[in-house]
Design a protein with these regions (language model features):
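Conserved active-site alpha-helix within GNAT-family acetyltransferase domains
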Residues: 102-137
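A conserved beta-strand-loop-helix scaffold within acyl/acetyltransferase catalytic domains
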Residues: 38-78
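Short amphipathic alpha-helix that is part of the acyltransferase structural core
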Residues: 1-35, 130, 145-146
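Acidic/histidine-enriched, glycine/proline-rich intrinsically disordered or flexible terminal extensions
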Residues: 138-146
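Conserved acetyl-CoA pyrophosphate-binding loop and the N-cap/start of the following alpha-helix
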Residues: 83-92
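Acidic/histidine-enriched, beta-strand-rich ligand/metal-binding domains
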Residues: 75, 82-84, 102, 118
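Conserved acyl-CoA
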Residues: 91-106
C-alpha cells in the first residue's frame, strides 16, 4: 500500500509492536493519562493488537478487547502526528474488522472524544437509548500494576 512516496503496512504480528513507543504515546493521551507501563503491557497482552508501519518504523497502533463472538471493544487507536491524514487510521480499523479471530463478532464498541467522523465511515453509529455503560471512577484509585 502506498500513500504518496510512503509505504504503509498494517501488521497483526504482536512481536513487531514497539511497546515503548506505543506506551509513550498512549500514556500522554487524553484517554489513558496516568496508565502505568505495567498496565499498558497487560492491556496489550490481553487483547488483539496491531501496528502500522512506514518503511519499517512503527507509526500507529490499535487494539481490540473481545470474547471473539458477542462483543469487541476498540481501544488505544493512534497515529503518529507526522503520519496523519494518510488514511492509516482507516486502514487499521479495516484490519481490525477483518482480523481472522474477530470475524464472528457482532457488536463493536469504542469511545472517542474527537474521531467520530472516521468511525462513522466504518459503520459505527452514535449509541441510542438501548445501550448502557458503567464507568467505575474508583478504578483509578486502586493499586496500579507495575
Amino acid at each position: 500500500m502506498a500513500d504518496g512516496d510512503k509505504t504503509i503496512e498494517i501488521s497483526l504480528d504482536r512481536s513487531r509492536i514497539d511497546l515503548e513507543y506505543c506506551y509513550d504515546f498512549i500514556a500522554a493521551s487524553y484517554w489513558a493519562a496516568g496508565r502505568t507501563r505495567g498496565e499498558f503491557d497487560r492491556s496489550v497482552e490481553m487483547s488483539f493488537p496491531l501496528g502500522a508501519y512506514c518503511d519499517g518504523r512503527q507509526v500507529g497502533f490499535a487494539r481490540v478487547v473481545s470474547d471473539q463472538i458477542a462483543i469487541a471493544y476498540v481501544a488505544d487507536v493512534f497515529v503518529d502526528p507526522d503520519y496523519r491524514r494518510m488514511g492509516i487510521a482507516a486502514k487499521m480499523i479495516d484490519a481490525l474488522h477483518n482480523h481472522p479471530e474477530l470475524k464472528r463478532v457482532k457488536r463493536w464498541l469504542l469511545a472517542t472524544a474527537d474521531m467520530q467522523p472516521l468511525y462513522r465511515l466504518h459503520g459505527y453509529a452514535d449509541l441510542d437509548d438501548m445501550m448502557m455503560m458503567r464507568l467505575d471512577e474508583d478504578a483509578r484509585n486502586r493499586d496500579p500494576l507495575r
